[in-house]
Amino acid sequence: MIIKTLLASVAIMLIATVNAEYNVAKYCELVKIGTLMPSMISCQDYYICRLNNQPIPVKCGANTVFDKDTQGCVPEAQANCILSLDNPCENKDRTFAPSSKACNEWHYCLNGNIVANGSCQPGQIFDASKNSCIYGACNSDDDDSNSDFTPVLNICDIMQNGQFFGDFENCQNWQKCNNGRLQKGICLGNLVYDTKNGMCLQNDGTMCERTNGMVSEDGGAPDETLCTSSNDGPLPDKLTCSVYYICEQDTTSTPTTYKWIKTSCPNGQYFDVFGDGCLDRAKRRVYTGCNRCEYTTGSTTYWVNAVSNDCTKFSTCRNGRKITNEDGSCNSGYYFNEADQYCNMGDFTNYAETNGACQNYSCNGYDCTTKPSAT
């Protein structure tokens, strides 16, 4: 009776559980547009990563399967499909086995075959030693702050061999799979890894969306050669609008040297590039390219003024980051109003007085100047 009840429960879970594909759109953020990603459900299925990281599902023809390394459909005998791995239910009967796809998923085995698949509750992982779900988090370098994102156990199972790709945690990091082994590196200086071009470049303000703007601790810091006395600075961080740097003496060194000290504005404030310190984020004139979506939290879409001299441009934000590469723009004769969350008709001069992104200024390095208003 107990066994029948267990099998009935598993059957119900199987009916209620859709086959768990990994979050393909999320991993498309790490690769170039046009990259082909394998399915974790069928060897014949794969996805094309398109603009804005939207995957398009495709299926190989008869008697062929997708091979991630050749980026195409090949005869079954020539493929490197991870679903051809040893059966996790081999030699198992009436028990559970961990999934090879994600740490919070499991299989139920009967007579050495998989008869059901399932997922643990949010906040839990499957513990093979206990044959049950326990509270915990996946131990993965590719974990993300979004609670609905479960990383694949081995990212090299889905990434093309020998090709560079980005990192979810740090915008300066790059990764590459060499015969199934993950290799990591970091871009030099203040460069970040641009997944669109597959190389290290100066950040244009859109390259770090996949990491919520997170870079290494000094990723947006000014060059150390600019810190030679306590009179230097403060200078803004190039990537995080709320961060700035103060040049202070390094008391641990002989002879006397100076180093930048990373400092953060209070919550809700940005650092002003004209040296006026921290103030309400809307009023500050920030370094062009820093993340103005910072402080927009939650899954609700929100729009903020992008730096522009005519106040027409706006960025689309969610969870503290831009979700589109290109900024939107109001029609001629309109300006974007953050408080109203839409484009208003008329002159923006009064609005610009208390909204720094609309004030006409430009920066050459850290030398910023104002210009006559564009009305």
From Swiss-Prot:
The keyword Signal applies. PROSITE patterns: CHIT_BIND_II. Cardia and midgut peritrophic membrane. Glycans are attached at residues 117, 360. It comes from the Eukaryota. Residues 25-83, 86-143, 153-210, 224-292, 294-360 form the Chitin-binding type-2 domain. The lineage of its organism: Eukaryota, Metazoa, Ecdysozoa, Arthropoda, Hexapoda. Keywords: Chitin-binding, Disulfide bond, Glycoprotein, Repeat, Signal. It comes from Lucilia cuprina. This is Peritrophin-48. GO terms for cellular component: extracellular region. Residues 1-20 form the signal peptide.
